[in-house]
Regions:
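Intrinsic-disorder-associated, low-complexity terminal segments enriched in Asp/Asn/His/Tyr and depleted
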Residues: 3-4, 21
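Acidic, Ala/Val/Gly-enriched low-complexity intrinsically disordered segments
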Residues: 17, 23-24, 28, 32, ...
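Acetyl-CoA-dependent GNAT
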Residues: 44, 51-124, 133-144, 191-193, ...
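Short acidic/glycine-enriched loop/turn segments that link adjacent beta-strands
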Residues: 81, 108, 157, 179-184
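Conserved glycine-rich acetyl-CoA-binding loop
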Residues: 116, 120-134, 143, 148, ...
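Conserved catalytic-core motifs of GNAT/GCN5-like acyltransferases
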Residues: 150-152, 165-187, 214
């Protein structure tokens, strides 16, 4: 897998990337996506997360339901899966939200994973989370040829669960005591085009423990 990218002043330059998985090359040009948010004339840009953003996105993580990690964790994702780490940026270079994920697994378990997706409270209800999720799904589906995308969510986080269901995700299984505080997690999945028979989203009939997870 070859990545040729440039980060200057916190902005990604449009680049050409050649990615090869399963011995199949794909030539893709990754460029920032700009759009007007609903009911607003302000331009929003979704671009790759850059090293400089690590010092600027703290305010987005203030929501108590947002899982946060140490700096080395974010650095690992930025280094290993840069194509799955994007930020939504508004006027004045203000970070509105971000998504962080990866691709992993083998055989029919080859999948994209959403590790974290969050939008700052003042920018919610503008479909930013949907746009970030769609971008990760497109990369998983069209570039990495994954079978599905999955994510974990707290069983008590009803608003997030409903949002994911609207985006086409289903509850695949319950993971007992997955989160701190002994709270259960829900493993939600969305089948991609490669999973023609939708085998990846057939729900399990029993809950599992974190030790039984193949990937997390």
């Amino acid at each position: 897998m070859g990545h040729h990218r440039s980060c200057k002043n916190g902005l990604w330059k449009p680049i050409g990337v050649t990615i090869s998985y399963l011995a199949v090359p794909f030539n893709v040009s990754f460029r920032a996506r700009s759009f007007f948010v609903p009911n607003s004339r302000k331009m929003t840009t979704i671009r790759r997360f850059c090293c400089n953003d690590l010092l600027r996105f703290t305010s987005v993580n203030l929501d108590h339901l947002t899982e946060t990690f140490n700096m080395s964790f974010y650095m690992t994702y930025l280094a290993r899966w840069p194509d799955y780490f994007h930020v939504a940026e508004g006027p004045g270079n203000r970070i509105m939200g971000y998504i962080m994920g990866k691709v992993e697994g083998q055989g029919e378990s080859w999948h994209g994973h959403v590790t974290a997706v969050t939008v700052s409270p003042e920018y919610r209800r503008q479909q930013l989370a949907k746009k970030l999720m769609n971008l990760l799904e497109d990369i998983s589906d069209k570039i990495d040829k994954a079978y599905f995308v999955d994510l974990f969510v707290r069983a008590s986080n009803t608003p997030a669960i409903k949002m994911y269901e609207k985006l086409g995700y289903v509850i695949y299984r319950r993971v007992l005591r997955y989160y701190s505080g002994e709270e259960d997690g829900l493993d939600m999945r969305k089948a991609l085009s490669r999973d023609v028979e939708k085998k990846s989203i057939i729900p399990l009939k029993r809950p599992v423990t974190p030790d039984e997870l193949e990937y997390d």
